Each structure stands twice: as C-alpha cells, then as structure tokens.
C-alpha cells in the first residue's frame, strides 16, 4: 500500500474552478491561490444566505488512542460516498496546525484514499490563515506592551495581563518567558508565555464569527488584562479591534479544496478540541449547508469534547443543528478501553471488545440526550477479525444503534457506501429535535456540573481555590451567562488520561477559569492540560524532506 503522500501525489487534481461548479459556485466567486485552492468571496456567501439549509452530518468519535481513530479520514470518505450515491455533498473540515504536523501527527488531511488535496499545501502554509491569526494575536500583545511603555493610561496591572503570545509550533520552552528585559527603552519587564496558535481566542473568534462586522465586535470584546482595581480591560479600551480585523479580513473567508474523489471541501479554521472548542468555522459550515443537500463536518477528539462543544457552543451560531451524528469507533481503541496493552492491540480479544464497548455506549447515550439520531461507523483495520466485528455489531444492536463497517482508507468512496446509506436512512427515519444540555441563564457551576455528570458520567465538579474566586468574580462581570468550554484530556471521560473505558465515581476538578468573552465562552482548565504542546522524542519532522524539484516527502 502506498503512503498517504504517495497516494495524494498520484491523484491528478482538477482546477478548483471546475470542482466547485458542482455546488453552484462560479469562477468569479473565487479568490484563487493557484489552480487548486481558493477562498470564497463575501459576495457569494451573502448571496446564498437565503437558501434553505440542507442536511448536516456531524462526525465524532469515541475517546481515542494516541494514534487517533480516523475521524477526518471517515468524514472525507463519508462525504465522497454520499457524492457517489448521488447526493449533492460538501465537506467542512478544520485546517491542520503546523505544530502537531511537525510533532506527532505528520499531517492532518485524512488518509489513504480519503484525503483532501493538495495535502502538502493544506498541511503546511495553505492560504496563510494560521499566519494571519498568529499575527493578529501577537499584534495585540505588542500593543498591550506598548500601552504599558507609553504611560499605561488604562491602569493595567502588568501582573494581571492574561493575553499570552502565540506560535503555530509545539515549543514547550516558550510556555513561560520574561519580556521587557534590558534597558527601560525595551519595555516594562513582566512574566509572559506562549500558547499554540490553535488555542488562541483569535482562532476561536474567527471560527465563530458570521461576518466582518461580527468579527470586529467579538475582537473588541476580548478581555486582555485586569486593572489594579481588578476590573477587566477589553480590546475596545485599547481601540485596536479595527486593526486586528484588518489583519484578518482575508483569513475569515472560507478556503475551498477538493477530495480525492472530487467532492468540494471547505477547510477553514482549526481550534483544538481539548483546549478550545474544536470545530471548523461557522462561515464554512453555514455556507456549505446553503450550497449542498448534505454537509459533512467533524468535531475534534472524542464526543465528550468536540461533539459536546459543537452542540453547546457552535450549533447556536448555525442555521440548524445536526440531522445525524456519526460516532467513529475502532476495534483497537475499544480493546484499549477494555484493558488491553498497546502492544497487544493487534491480537484478537472479543472479551476486551465487550468490556471496552462501555466507552462507545456512553458516547451514544450522550448524543441521544441532544435528541439527534446516531450511527456508529467502524473504521476497519487489517488486524480486525470477523469475530471482533460480529461482537461489536451485536452490542450495537442491543442498544438499537445502526452500525456499519467502513473501509474508506483503503477503498475511498466505495468503502463508505454502506455507511452513507445508513446515515441517509437514519436522517429519513428519525427527525432530530435538538436541545442543548444547559441554558444560558444557568450559572457557570450548573453548566459545568451538567457536563461532568451528564456527559462524562462523573459524580460532580470540584473547584480549586483560584477557580472558586473566579466563579464569584465572573458572575459580577456577567460572564456566567456564557457557555463553558472544558480543557480536558482527550483520552478519558475523566481528567485522568489513564482512566479508560467508561469510568464513574470520579470528580472533575477545575483549577482555573479563563474568560474568552470575545469568542463567547469560558474555558475551564482541568488536570495538567497544556495550551502549548511539546514535541515527542522523535518528532515527525525528522522524517520530512523536500526533493530538488520541490516535492514534499514524509508528510502522512
């Protein structure tokens, strides 16, 4: 079998102007970045706003193994399969972060014969969105430090600046830094730090904004620091939201590319799901809904993170809720949740599949709490056995959830046809009646408790000393009306990554709350989740290269 990059490079690409005609987009509606990438114009986005939205399919997963469970690959394969069975389909995915590409992932544009193309461009600099977001974020950092240097008219307490700098790389050595060292002309010395760009509030804002006006309003509402009297300081106090929006004026436009099978795909925005809300842009998803009969999108990591945030944070900003949710499961992950060591996952173990099924079952039950139909997709691997597959199908039948085997990695669209038909049937047979898990009027504590008890299966939520004080403080500022965004390990329902399966009798401890008032949510930090990842001992970058003719090597 060829590698992902070899498959991608063997596919003859069609001009993007030809691909997008399938969904009613003309060449004049595009801002081209070469022959195979484009941004969609604001004029076209506005012109389709009156269109009735099509069906929305959200792809999520069980709690993953470190290698991931192929959620992006399944999303792409499902979209291609829907196209193949005659459905007018679009795909709406996140764009990769360069940090994990160079770190552990090596790429994030699907895999095998279910990829978005050109994969090298998408995995590297693409259309420059990450650069624009990084620049806008760090421009604000520079403006804050300049304000301190120029007399600090707003009375900002340098010890209480909460706006860190960002970089689209994994670099643990930048988590905590000191800026302003040297002579007085170098600024006011203070503690600072770096997050990865996909954890930036600017990224979240770009992904939730509905247009440039909304983008500017959200940027203005970012909390950057506190004064000596502990009152919050906003971007609007610095009067720089216009400049930040200017830097982002092109980045907010959704990017268009193609799948191997030729399905039009929006790839736009990329917040992580463990430290941010984990969904691609509202603009891309909303526009896809108004252009196609079926839109396939995804939310990062497991359904306890990405799907919960999609349904509680993103969905209220969309023209409609999902019509169906596909939960991707692999037998290797179920066996790991059933207690099998990583080294033994390739061996048949039906007992471990039965035990690990508790993880999948809880995810299915959770999605049903939102009143949305669920379909399980088994992402097939060559090490899967007939006995293990049969056991999983029987277990799914016991909880009355449709299940289909999908081999889109190996077979592309053909490997996803059964899944596509199952999803279409689920939508036709069972109407979604979406309801949120909590109301805006609920307190932050009530919202967090609902997530911990209803989604994670825990006993309750505990608050550390800092978080306890912040609950009172945030209520005074009116921020308790915002939804919550949990920053938690992706490997477990709990905040302990080693607690696999479907644990109960555990508490989640919130150590800190972070206001993301521009994005419109409050981040709750749990465990030791880092907002600036580090690199592994052997980074994927060590296997990457470029040939003399400019061909990329080692992306996967």
From Swiss-Prot:
Pathway terms, separated by semicolons: One-carbon metabolism; tetrahydrofolate interconversion
InterPro entries recorded: Formate_THF_ligase, Formate_THF_ligase_CS, P-loop_NTPase
UniProt cross-references to SUPFAM superfamilies, sorted A to Z: P-loop containing nucleoside triphosphate hydrolases (SSF52540)
Binding site for ATP: 65-72
Keyword field: ATP-binding, Ligase, Nucleotide-binding, One-carbon metabolism
GO terms under biological process: tetrahydrofolate interconversion
Name the record gives this protein: Formate--tetrahydrofolate ligase
């Amino acid at each position: 079998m060829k590698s992902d990059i070899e498959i991608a490079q063997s596919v003859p690409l069609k001009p993007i102007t030809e691909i997008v005609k399938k969904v009613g987009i003309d060449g004049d509606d595009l801002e081209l970045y070469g022959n195979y990438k484009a941004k969609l114009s604001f004029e076209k986005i506005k012109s389709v706003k009156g269109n009735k939205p099509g069906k929305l399919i959200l792809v999520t997963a069980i709690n993953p193994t470190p290698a991931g469970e192929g959620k992006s690959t399944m999303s792409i394969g499902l979209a291609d399969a829907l196209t193949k069975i005659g459905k007018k389909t679009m795909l709406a995915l996140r764009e990769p972060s360069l940090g994990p590409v160079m770190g552990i992932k090596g790429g994030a544009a699907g895999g095998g014969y279910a990829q978005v193309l050109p994969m090298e461009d998408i995995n590297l600099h693409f259309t420059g969105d990450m650069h624009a977001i990084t620049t806008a974020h760090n421009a604000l950092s520079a403006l804050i430090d300049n304000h301190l240097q120029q007399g600090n008219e707003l009375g900002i307490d340098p010890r209480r600046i909460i706006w860190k700098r960002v970089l689209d790389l994994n670099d643990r050595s930048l988590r905590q830094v000191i800026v302003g060292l040297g002579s007085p002309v170098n600024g006011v010395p203070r503690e600072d730090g770096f997050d990865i760009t996909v954890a930036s509030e600017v990224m979240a804002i770009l992904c939730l904004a509905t247009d440039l006006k909304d983008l500017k309003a959200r940027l203005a509402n970012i909390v950057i620091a506190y004064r000596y009297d502990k009152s919050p300081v906003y971007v609007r106090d610095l009067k720089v939201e216009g400049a930040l929006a200017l830097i982002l004026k092109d980045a907010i436009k959704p990017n268009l590319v193609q799948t191997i099978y030729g399905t039009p795909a929006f790839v736009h925005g990329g917040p992580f799901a463990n430290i941010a809300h984990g969904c691609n842009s509202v603009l891309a998803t909303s526009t896809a809904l108004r252009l196609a009969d079926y839109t396939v999108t995804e939310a990062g990591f497991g359904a306890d993170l990405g799907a919960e945030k999609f349904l509680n944070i993103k969905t209220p900003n969309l023209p409609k809720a999902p019509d169906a949710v596909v939960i991707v499961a692999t037998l290797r992950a179920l066996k790991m949740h059933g207690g099998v060591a990583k080294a033994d996952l390739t061996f048949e173990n039906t007992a471990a599949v039965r035990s690990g099924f508790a993880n999948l079952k809880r995810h299915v039950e959770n999605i049903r709490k939102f009143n949305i139909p669920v379909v399980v997709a088994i992402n097939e691997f060559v090490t899967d056995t007939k006995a293990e597959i049969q056991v999983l199908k029987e277990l799914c039948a016991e909880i009355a959830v449709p299940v289909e085997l999908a081999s889109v990695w190996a077979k592309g669209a053909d490997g996803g046809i059964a899944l596509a038909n199952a999803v279409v049937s689920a939508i036709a047979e069972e109407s979604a009646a979406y309801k949120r898990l909590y109301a805006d009027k609920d307190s932050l504590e009530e919202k967090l408790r609902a997530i911990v008890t209803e989604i994670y299966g825990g006993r309750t939520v505990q608050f550390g000393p800092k978080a306890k004080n912040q609950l009172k403080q945030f209520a005074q500022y009116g921020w308790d009306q915002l939804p919550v965004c949990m920053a938690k390990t992706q490997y477990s329902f709990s905040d302990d990554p080693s607690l696999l399966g479907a644990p109960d009798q555990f508490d989640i401890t919130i150590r800190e709350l972070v206001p993301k008032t521009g994005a419109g949510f409050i981040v709750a930090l749990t465990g030791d989740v880092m907002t600036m990842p580090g690199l592994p001992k052997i980074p994927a970058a060590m296997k990457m290269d470029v040939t003399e003719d400019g061909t990329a090597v080692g992306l996967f």
